[in-house]
Amino acid sequence: MSLDFLPFSRPSIGEDEIAAVEQVLRSGWITTGPQNQELEQRFAERLGCRHAVALSSATGALHVTLLALGIGPGDEVITPSLTWVSTANVITLLGATPVFVDVDRDTLMCSAQAVEAAIGPRTRAIVPVHYAGSTLDLEGLRTVAGRHGIALVEDAAHAVGSEYRGRPVGARGTAIFSFHAIKNLTCAEGAMFVSDDSALAERVRRLKFHGLGVDAYDRLSHGRKPQAEVIEPGFKYNLADLNAALALVQLKRLDALNARRQALAERYLERLAGLPLAPLGLPAHAQRHAWHLFILRIDAEACGLGRDAFMEALKARGIGSGIHFIASHLHHYYRQRQPRLSLPNSEWNSARLCSIPLFPDMRDDDIERVARAIEDILEKRR
């Protein structure tokens, strides 16, 4: 008997989420409105941050954040190459240059030392990445950014619910979270910008909605004049209340969802111990891991087959997997522009990374199924 296909990720959506979305549909106000305002308030309260601004995607959030920081043609932004390519794309589309740095081979995160070595006279910002639910060594990065007077914008797309040295990621400084369909907290598409910089937050809020000082719901609820004025040209990155309502329920469930992810990840670590799979290493500092992804490194010499063949073998057994990620500088567009750039750790991992199924609705026997499939694949290659 064939088993149902097990995807590498699936959103955990229950009756409460469905009811919340239905309530918005019946309310007559489905775009940006009261659900957005509540989501921003609840998210800021959870993190203990000063400002939270909801947007339609983390890519859009990064776009307006860098724009609000004044980044444009001739500027440089330091970021790890081993991340989703949207970061490099946004920097490039602003007319700036992404300066790619290598990552630690085992944690897949960049160090303060690597970032500082890449700083030049045109460096205007640093965009480091919290990876797979694990956390950057923020103290070192904050010290470097402060010493050079450079903006630090944390890519926290993988880190909703993560903690660094006892405090939530995003409690201090500026960070961007993703609510994409596979993230720990999802509303299908969405994001949250957080910051303790009031001027930056105000400009991000303005730029996300046409450069207007207020949105339609703000004008309605506060009795302001019906025609708002453009303060500066902006974009259309506001989050609909349909999405915000879904995110609010997910935010209430976040601790339970992440606890389940942790339990599943711990079971994987137990079951796969001793196999030549090289799961990611953990940083030395105290943290709470959100376990957004469970990543293996499939080395052909150690495992008897390469990553792509391993993924095909999983697929043949009804198990999905993913690659997070191919380093940005290896993509055609960026390789053409920086043909000599060599980042050994990013390149080594790009050829070996494999994300296996991890999502809260997985059963314990799903972990056993994946583990047995992996054992079978490796055994056949010995």
Curated annotation (Swiss-Prot):
InterPro entries: ArnB_NH2Trfase, DegT/StrS_aminotransferase, PyrdxlP-dep_Trfase, PyrdxlP-dep_Trfase_major, PyrdxlP-dep_Trfase_small
PANTHER family: DTDP-4-AMINO-4,6-DIDEOXYGALACTOSE TRANSAMINASE, TRANSAMINASE
A Gene Ontology cellular-component term: membrane
Catalytic activity, reaction form: UDP-4-amino-4-deoxy-beta-L-arabinose + 2-oxoglutarate = UDP-beta-L-threo-pentopyranos-4-ulose + L-glutamate
The name this protein goes by in its record: UDP-4-amino-4-deoxy-L-arabinose--oxoglutarate aminotransferase
Domain of life: Bacteria
Residues the record lists as N6-(pyridoxal phosphate)lysine modifications: K183
EC assignment: 2.6.1.87
